[in-house]
A protein has these predicted regions:
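Nucleic-acid endonuclease domains
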Residues: 1-9, 25-162
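Conserved catalytic cores of phosphodiester-cleaving nucleases, focusing on short active-site segments
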Residues: 13-26
């Protein structure tokens, strides 16, 4: 239930009173995170808010998207509601089993960064832009964001997910 991004959620995951936005990059230079709206990093309604960046690299030894989907399905196998929710979210995200043979690229996780979005985090929000600015997309370089990356498990604990 927490994966709400494919259902037009403002952020990818909502857990407890907080949320988690996940960005992926293939870039070897910097750690770019493309932000899709003014609301995406606005923590005024849900706290805590975390931004996770996953650096992937394309490699023959990596995992394909259909393999990752199969792994996720294995995790929820035997639980009717999670199976239904995962299938619903995958379709909403544009993943269809009939197209699995088209996903030939393989990726490995090279690095992950998880940062808590707080007052000093560089971001644009509806309350921080001039009157009249109603939409914006922008990019943040996570290599240049002040503050430490925290372990994923720590963020999930703070969100009440584990």
């Amino acid at each position: 239930e927490s994966w709400v991004g494919p259902l037009d959620g403002v952020r990818d995951f909502e857990m407890g009173t907080g949320s988690l936005e996940v960005k992926a990059t293939l870039s070897a230079v910097g750690f770019p995170a493309k932000i899709g709206s003014l609301e995406q990093l606005d923590d005024s309604a849900r706290q805590p808010l975390f931004l996770a960046g996953a650096r992937l690299r394309q490699t023959d030894n990596g995992q394909s998207l259909p393999e990752l989907v199969a792994d996720m399905r294995d995790v929820v196998a035997g639980y009717a509601e999670p199976v239904r929710l995962l299938s619903e979210r995958l379709i909403a995200a544009g993943y269809f089993d009939a197209h699995a043979d088209r996903y030939v690229r393989r990726f490995a996780l090279a690095d992950i960064r998880v940062v808590e979005v707080k007052d000093d985090f560089p971001r644009l929000t509806p309350g921080s832009v001039p009157l009249g600015v109603t939409k914006a997309t922008y990019e943040i370089d996570l290599d240049k964001v002040l503050g430490p990356s925290i372990p994923t498990a720590d963020a999930l604990k703070k969100l009440g997910a584990i």
